[in-house]
Amino acid sequence: MRKWRLLALNKSTQIRRMPDAIFPFYNEYLMKQQFSLRASVCLALATLASSSALAAGFQVNEHSANGLGRAMAGQAAKPENASILATNPAAIGVFKEAEFSASVSFIDPNVDIDGDVSYALGEAPVGQPMPAAEDNIADTAFVPGFFYVSPINEKLSAGVGVFTTYGLRSDYSDDFGALHFADTAEVKTVTLNPAVSYKVNKQLMVGFGLNITYAEAEIGSGVSNTLAGTVAGLAPTAEALGITLPTLTPGNSLFSMEGDDWGYGWNAGIFWQPTDMTNVALSYRAETKLELEGAVSSETPVFPINLNQPGSLD
């Protein structure tokens, strides 16, 4: 008889405060900005090209309610249900009949930004530093996962999982003082993970899986109320220098980029049961490289080229 198991709803806080940092991701059109943050969710956009998304603080590894109850401790060595496929493909060989597991993780992030922003025209500071703070910039999310495993014969087992390993969404209001650094940021991924396990003997199993990942992302910066007011205030000075500044509309995008890509990787594992009471496991998930391609757009007029400043996303 086939055994079907549906895991309970997972509820976890996935994102916590991050170290001081911020990233510029567009040419700083008018001024050199100095912007310090004590916390910033948007740094996770660097995971798009990172060799280890799981180290970026936005991992989604709640594939099992059982594992969540242990804070994922020893997850690769605890084949309680089919979701073990995500952490150790070798361990799917433990099951003597087909199993299906499904989970839903509710991610309730609590990310607050607290800092200030200052402006300069050339090397000359303009005005006093202004606050750039906002609460609860990251959205809640429901993240599903599905897993199926089944023995093929006495030696071989196979399975497949559909889940995500990382993702985020953040959004700032028009009142955020540093909206020209960060406005909307969203990363969505889904991974298809077929896997096989081979039983070397009664105690030892080895497993291998393929990771086929689709990712899409959107990042952008916008015109804040503060920036629009600052540019308007600089207009007379710029006019005296022979420079005409455009009128900025709060809420319009300075820079918006969206794209998608497919990436491929692999995972492998070893599962050893030296005794009935002891499990030993070793697992590894290789990097999946993603190079997103898409479109870039802006709702804001371009500033004079001599006032542009370089920007980058690391």
Predicted regions: what they are:
Residues Q75-P79, L85-K96, Y148-E154, G167:
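Outer-membrane beta-barrel pore proteins
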Residues A56-A71, A120-A133, T140-D314:
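Outer-membrane beta-barrel porins/channels
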Residues M31-L54:
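Gram-negative bacterial Sec-dependent N-terminal signal peptides
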Residues Q14-L30:
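Short, Lys/Arg-enriched N-terminal segments with co-localized hydrophobic residues
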Residues R5, P24-E28, N61, A71-A73:
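Long, low-complexity, polar and repeat-rich extracellular regions
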Residues F58-G74, G93-D112:
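Transmembrane beta-strand segments of Gram-negative outer membrane beta-barrel proteins
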Residues W4-L9, M18-F23, S40:
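Short, often N-terminal, low-complexity regions
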Residues E97, D114-L121:
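Glycine-rich loop at the start of a catalytic domain that most often binds anionic cofactors/ligands
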